[in-house]
């Protein structure tokens, strides 16, 4: 791959809190196009906690993907469940990035976010996750001598 080739990203979207993540998905795709990247695959996960499994399968079977942006919204409830979900997903996503040698970026709102806060943050988190994925993929190619 030359430096002029497009970066190919995959987007993994949690279906839980879909009123928020649907907006995130749309904004992420728009921002990837703006950055000149190709969204080669959009995969859905039942919830944020499940995203590492989807990312693992995706990276194991789609070698053409340069990076993955993960989108989710973990809304605060009456217990600390939101903290467990967000922290465990984040930790495992980082592990997968290291394991596969490909960027996996975190566009997960929460823990501790209200529904209103999640709605307000949706576009920003989606854009930041995609931008990080594209930048990291480019830098990875530079470091590996592909550019």
From Swiss-Prot:
Catalytic activity: (2S)-2-hydroxy-3-oxobutyl phosphate + 5-amino-6-(D-ribitylamino)uracil = 6,7-dimethyl-8-(1-D-ribityl)lumazine + phosphate + 2 H2O + H(+)
Enzyme Commission number, as recorded: 2.5.1.78
Pfam family, one: DMRL_synthase
GO biological process, one term: riboflavin biosynthetic process
Molecular function per GO: 6,7-dimethyl-8-ribityllumazine synthase activity
Family assignment from sequence similarity: Belongs to the DMRL synthase family.
HAMAP family in UniProt: Lumazine_synth (MF_00178)
Job of this protein: Catalyzes the formation of 6,7-dimethyl-8-ribityllumazine by condensation of 5-amino-6-(D-ribitylamino)uracil with 3,4-dihydroxy-2-butanone 4-phosphate. This is the penultimate step in the biosynthesis of riboflavin.
Record-given protein name: 6,7-dimethyl-8-ribityllumazine synthase
The organism of origin for this protein: Aeropyrum pernix (strain ATCC 700893 / DSM 11879 / JCM 9820 / NBRC 100138 / K1)
């Amino acid at each position: 791959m030359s430096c002029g080739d497009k970066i190919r990203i995959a987007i993994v979207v949690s279906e839980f809190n879909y009123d928020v993540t649907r907006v995130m998905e749309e904004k992420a795709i728009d921002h990837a196009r703006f950055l000149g990247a190709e969204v080669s695959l959009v995969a859905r996960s039942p919830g944020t906690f499940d995203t590492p499994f989807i990312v693992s399968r995706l990276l194991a079977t789609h070698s053409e993907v340069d990076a993955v942006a993960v989108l989710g919204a973990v809304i605060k409830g009456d217990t600390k469940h939101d903290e467990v979900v967000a922290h465990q997903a984040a930790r495992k996503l980082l592990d997968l990035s290291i394991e596969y040698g490909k960027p996996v970026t975190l566009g997960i709102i929460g823990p501790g976010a209200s529904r209103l806060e999640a709605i307000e943050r949706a576009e920003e988190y989606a854009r930041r996750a995609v931008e990080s994925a594209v930048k990291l993929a480019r830098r990875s190619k530079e470091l590996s001598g592909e550019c």
